[in-house]
Amino acid sequence: MNLSVKLPGLNLKNPIMPASGCFGFGKEYSEYYDLSLLGGVMMKAATQFERLGNPTPRVAETSAGMLNAIGLQNPGVQQIIDHEVPRLAKYDTSIIANIAGSSIEEYEFVAASFNQTTDVDALELNISCPNVKEGGIQFGTDPFMAKKVTEVVKKASNKPVYVKLSPNVHNIVEMAKAVEEAGADGLSMINTLTGMKIHLPSRKPLIANKTGGLSGPAIKPVAIRMIYEVRQQVSIPIIGMGGITSAEDVLEYLIAGADAVAVGTANFQNPFVCVDIINELPEVLEQYGFNSIEDVIEKRGITV
């Protein structure tokens, strides 16, 4: 069965990618399976200079997901270009670089830096991280700022730009339309929902940042609803994410309006989850009457 999907800058052999922030740069997972099996790899966020991230503890389990406040820890864009991209480029898969910053100028610098390499196929513009004090969410909750940083990154880069949207907004359709008007080639949605968990004996938050981003199965219904709403109002492709653990979840995302998906938290529970989903997808598509991913996309839409 044909699982391929064509998106701006990305010829995916299948629609399955590990989500940025949940897969590092793929080094540990490459010890489990051949990364060439993946439709693509969304690398961990890159900033201009090295970031050490937030104080520990930075991760806490919840009943239906995970809270994290990593804080965009990364070695800096030049280290990523010099060491991580060449290693990933040995695999037959698409590479998407997630870019972040504390200012518009930093976003511009990081986006322009990735022009150094032809091995990066597209950029994912991270304006939705809830766990940093500067940058990130301040751009992702204001349509004017989201549009402005998208325009700057588009001018700085010769690669397609997918803007990662935050669910922590009043109107996500307004955000999606703003970045589409700014020239975004696609959307990634959704990032994590802001949450908190308290240790009862001490009455202290379980993570040092007090609040963190909630991911995992708990947020899937929110993501499906937001993708469905955005799909009715914008025409650019959507890479859907949030609580995907199975091939059935992937089909649900595609029907709601996504064109490809990214798998995040489930990688921590089962390092083979992406490969498992790729293997199970043909049977699930056939079960529900589809003969390819493009067939789902052409026929998608919910019945009422």
UniProtKB/Swiss-Prot annotation:
It holds the Pfam family DHO_dh. The keyword Transferase does not apply. The active site is at 129 (nucleophile). It is an enzyme of class 1 (oxidoreductase). Pathway: Pyrimidine metabolism; UMP biosynthesis via de novo pathway; orotate from (S)-dihydroorotate (NAD(+) route): step 1/1. Its cofactor is FMN. Its EC number is 1.3.1.14. GO terms for molecular function: dihydroorotate dehydrogenase (NAD+) activity. It is found in: Cytoplasm. It catalyses: (S)-dihydroorotate + NAD(+) = orotate + NADH + H(+). Keywords: Cytoplasm, Flavoprotein, FMN, NAD, Oxidoreductase, Pyrimidine biosynthesis. SUPFAM superfamilies: FMN-linked oxidoreductases. GO terms for biological process: 'de novo' pyrimidine nucleobase biosynthetic process; 'de novo' UMP biosynthetic process. Binds 1 FMN per subunit. Belongs to the dihydroorotate dehydrogenase family. Type 1 subfamily. Heterotetramer of 2 PyrK and 2 PyrD type B subunits. Catalyzes the conversion of dihydroorotate to orotate with NAD(+) as electron acceptor. This is Dihydroorotate dehydrogenase B (NAD(+)), catalytic subunit. The gene is pyrD.
